[in-house]
Amino acid sequence: MLRVVEGIFIFVVISEXVFGVLGNGFIGLVNCIDCAKNKLSTIGFILTGLAISRIFLIWIIITDGFIQIFSPDIYASGNLIEYISYFWVIGNQSSMWFATSLSIFYFLKIANFSNYIFLWLKSRTNMVLPFMIVFLLISSLLNFAHIAKILNDYKMKNDTVWDLNMYKSEYFIKQILLNLGVIFFFTLSLITCVFLIISLWRHNRQMQSNVTGLRDSNTEAHVKAMKVLISFXILFILYFIGMAIEISCFTVRENKLLLMFGMTTTAIYPWGHSFILILGNSKLKQASLRVLQQLKCCEKRKNLRVT
């Protein structure tokens, strides 16, 4: 029975990885075509970076998970766990700061506040976003340097060999330190999400006072952005839960089923949010519909040739 359940989990994880690569690859491809036509916008640049970083993150999640499931002893020899930790931090942090940039972009473009600083930033969104991306990148690099020091100190402490039988509390503390930068970016995204909710509530109250009874384009934009940001927050919480399960399984290696469940939960975030972005972005949605129409036409042609 366990073998069957394990097989189901492995199938689900592989399917998530395939969907994740296809979804994020589609986002990246559409925006790269726009870049070739010199039509790449700020949002297009952010989505391209987010797609590439998430493809990288998916491969790290799958590689790390399968090594822990099928060849856990490999971690005990050499520096593999150190290299995977570095790659995971790069993929995780780059994915988060692109996602945070996307949240800030939605906030500046859609939200309505009378605050002078907000209005100044809103009028210069296309100038502010590049500086914001650079700021997030620099903070990621500084955090990465701190992470490298943590990993190096821990490695030296254990005589250049990673001790898999470390105290659980010490291992969890190390993982919390590794995720400090990600938690900071996620907090920024949550703050922008809360401000968008406040802006939507105030806008709806103004619309009700006008007694129009119709949803204007501003309300639609608010709702669409809220769906993307709330789904991001929910999926990222699931991602964190999955990571916590995987970390706990790292210290207790007997429970493979729990590890597979954690890996399945973790992989939902990078592939699920990509499809939400496709459905929430009019350009990506239209491009996906055109692709589906082309696939249907190809299928009809094949059927006609067979008959």
UniProtKB/Swiss-Prot annotation:
List the disulfide bonds in this chain.
Answer: none
Q: What is this protein called?
A: Taste receptor type 2 member 10
- Gene3D superfamilies in the record, alphabetically? Rhodopsin 7-helix transmembrane proteins (1.20.1070.10)
List the lineage, top down.
Eukaryota, Metazoa, Chordata, Craniata, Vertebrata
Look up the coiled coil feature and give its residue ranges: none
Which residues does the record list as glycosylated? 92, 158
Task: Could you list this entry's UniProt keywords, alphabetically sorted.
Answer: G-protein coupled receptor, Glycoprotein, Membrane, Receptor, Sensory transduction, Taste, Transducer, Transmembrane, Transmembrane helix
Q: Which family does it belong to?
A: Belongs to the G-protein coupled receptor T2R family.
**One Pfam family recorded for the sequence:** TAS2R
**More info:** Most taste cells may be activated by a limited number of bitter compounds; individual taste cells can discriminate among bitter stimuli.
Membrane is among the record's keywords: yes
Which residues are listed as membrane-spanning? 7-27, 43-63, 101-121, 127-147, 180-200, 228-248, 258-278
Query: SUPFAM superfamilies annotated for this entry?
Result: Family A G protein-coupled receptor-like
Q: Indicate where this protein is primarily found.
A: membrane
Which species expresses this protein natively? Gorilla gorilla gorilla
Q: Topology: which residues are Extracellular?
A: 1-6, 64-100, 148-179, 249-257
Per its UniProt record, what InterPro entries does this chain match? TAS2R
